[in-house]
Amino acid sequence: MADIDARLREDVHLLGELLGNTIREQRGAEFLDKIERIRKGAKAGRRGSAEGAEQLSASVDGLGDDELLPVARAFNQFLNLANIAEQYQLMHRRDDTQPLPFESRVLPELLDRLKTEGHTPDALARQLSKLEIELVLTAHPTEVARRTLIQKYDAIAAQLAALDHRDLNSTERAQITSRLQRLIAEAWHTEEIRRIRPTPVDEAKWGFAVIEHSLWHAIPNYLRKADHALHAATGLNLPLEAAPIRFASWMGGDRDGNPNVTAIVTREVLLLARWMAADLYLRDVDNLAAELSMQQASDALRARVGDSAEPYRAELKRLRERLRATRNWANASLSETLPAPEAVLRDNRELLDPLLLCFQSLHECGMGVIADGPLLDCLRRAVTFGLFLVRLDVRQDSSRHCAAMTEITDYLGLGRYEEWDEQTRIDFLLRELNNRRPLLPGYFKPAADTAEVLATCRVVAAAPTASLGSYVISMAGSASDVLAVQLLLKEAGLQRPMRVVPLFETLADLDNAGPVIEKLLGLPGYRSRLHGPQEVMIGYSDSAKDAGTTAAAWAQYRAQEKLVEICREQQVELLLFHGRGGTVGRGGGPAHAAILSQPPGSVAGRFRTTEQGEMIRFKFGLPDIAEQNLNLYLAAVLEATLLPPPPPQPSWRTMMDQMAADGVGAYRAVVRENPEFVEYFRQATPEQELGRLPLGSRPAKRREGGVESLRAIPWIFAWTQTRLMLPAWLGWEAALSKALERGEGTVLAQMREQWPFFRTRIDMLEMVLAKADSDIARLYDERLVSAELQHLGAHLRDLLSQACNVVLGLTGQKQLLAHSPETLEFISLRNTYLDPLHLLQAELLSRSRSREASLDSPLELALLVSVAGIAAGLRNTG
């Protein structure tokens, strides 16, 4: 551990020194001295020096308006460079004396354990190859880093790897350092922040870039290692057409609260995905054609290509022509609707079969070593990504469907749908679903909102089946919400099954999820249309905002248990879709632990979850890191399927019921019932300013109003910027303290020891409390909050202190995260660069609120840079 610390600090020191050189060259030595004084003041302040803290504060206060932006940029760049060093450290810095990282050994060790538990080799191979894990990439307003910069950061990581060789001579070391200096200078002189809000298409292109630069390479690598682990444990191989992990996307499909995502945008994103897939396969096939110059071929391949002297190249040439035709058609279709020529690839078999033919021929002719190289990689990609790269989900709020149905029934003279009771709605919807005639006449001219809903349904109906995932209904609360979407899709001409997925996201809706699904599955007209599993989405963000994470986590657990029970009774398979955020307050945290903490039976070989924008870069932005995270998902879902945790004991349930009640009471007493809270929130955090900044294509609010009108992301994000982290812990301090006051400490210890659900909750709570910082939060209050509201901030900081103390008591530690010195080291390293950014942000907010400033003024740009830097520094709580 000490060796890792020393090496990490060595890398950070080097990168910081090179950044300093760049800053000195542009701004002069005097300006660099200011930066260094601020950094040293922050470092001394962290060590408890009052003089250091005063020096830091005075240095920031003394900055002129023209210095605010470059100072903010300097510390933002420091944090991004520290992230690069940390990611590299976690991935590569291990010599032969150190054990393999957990992510690399988790699957082999699990397979050995499963064999010991009595699972046969055949059963293990069968289960691993039929796993269905889908990671759904979503846009996220806190992912503000530009793709241009991300590529430069990746190049810096590559140079750190090049430097990490003991046999380098001084000339080689100097050359690598020079390349690092150039890359850091390029990053410094590149504007890191978008000045205009990205469009949904921009966000989708960002997602495609992650696939192109990282996942495209990681997929065959992780599958090769999974195949090796399976063979070592069982003697069996992973089938060629196994794709345990696939990808879907919400970028360009999620229109909930985002008027910028229209039917036209969704069609464009579907075509862009098709173009991108064809382009990536073309690159692969070009490389394969260059490599596969062999003459010997199987009879099956000869039957296809005749007596060609280069049979593999001949077969690949045909595929290349079809891929080119597909790419050209998709590109042309972006500007006008065109029929697809015959050469365009329509079915994944048309892509797979030529590759399989070449693969099998090489094996038959004794050239397996060639087949198992890049050709196998291309095959694995073709199975995983298909012709459409990702499956696009569509998401819309239930109220939009209700409004559309109301306009339709009103027009038809049937009354107002929104005023009908639930049973009347169900009867009407089932009747129309079974009716062969259209519901609407061709001359119906709906209002703009209804027209957009219907246009979206028409895009869905026209799109190829394999290009789409699920139609998700946010704020679902009844069976009719699902049936209404089915009817709207039928009316648009959809003639194939499509998963229509209710998303239950408030506390009340989570409690009602079981009864709603039970009602749906009890309708013969619905069951006859259900092909495959019943998919249900569990919302983590809004339930936590509604009730606090204590009550929300328990409601999510109980809802899943109930859904498992109902689907088992109804003999229907269940697919749970987890709408987790990157932050703890939105259900985030390490995926491996989260999956293993799900209720028994809820992960039965299937798992679907969102991956949020800011976490996509950290978990999947580099091929090696993506590979590790794919390994973790694969192992966790396999373990949760074959070794599910036992159900909680009755006494634990009783305890959680009481803690949830105490937690929601304490949370709502602050957030909902204190009349001063909303005003304090708006003064103490950058919430108002975040709404003005170009952070993502979606508006920050659903509508005007208080906390309930905020989307979950800015709600969490605002508290994270000030380090109070309130949404992630508020309620737990009361729930745990009251349990201890009742003398139930032994039961709590037992729950933490024996129940993965509770242990994971406490671990996540401890992690977020370690990143929270009362002193930083107080600093914002002192500069931004009016005197009459200061007492509320002090009260919240007292509650934070209470939460820290009760968690320390529960874990038996003297310091949060004492059991994880590596994580503590990473937090400590970042604080030196975060502290000045927090102080700077508070000063920027103070200056911004006292004067009018245009969105492109240095003041506003510096504020945006500070937001991005703090998000980068805090990562999974950013």
Swiss-Prot record:
The reaction(s) this protein catalyses: oxaloacetate + phosphate = phosphoenolpyruvate + hydrogencarbonate
EC code: 4.1.1.31
GO cellular component: cytosol
Cofactor: Mg(2+)
Annotated catalytic residues: H140, K545
PROSITE patterns: PEPCASE_1, PEPCASE_2
Chain's gene name: ppc
Function summary: Forms oxaloacetate, a four-carbon dicarboxylic acid source for the tricarboxylic acid cycle.
Alphabetized PANTHER family for the sequence: PHOSPHOENOLPYRUVATE CARBOXYLASE
GO biological process: one example: tricarboxylic acid cycle
Enzyme class: lyase
Entry-linked InterPro entries: PEP_COase (IPR021135), PEP_COase_bac/pln-type (IPR022805), PEP_COase_Lys_AS (IPR018129), PEPCASE_His_AS (IPR033129), Pyrv/PenolPyrv_kinase-like_dom (IPR015813)
Keywords attached to this entry: Carbon dioxide fixation, Lyase, Magnesium
Gene Ontology terms for molecular function: magnesium ion binding; phosphoenolpyruvate carboxylase activity
Protein family per UniProt: Belongs to the PEPCase type 1 family.
Species for this entry: Pseudomonas savastanoi pv. phaseolicola (strain 1448A / Race 6) (Pseudomonas syringae pv. phaseolicola (strain 1448A / Race 6))
HAMAP family listed in its UniProt record: PEPcase_type1
Name of the featured protein: Phosphoenolpyruvate carboxylase
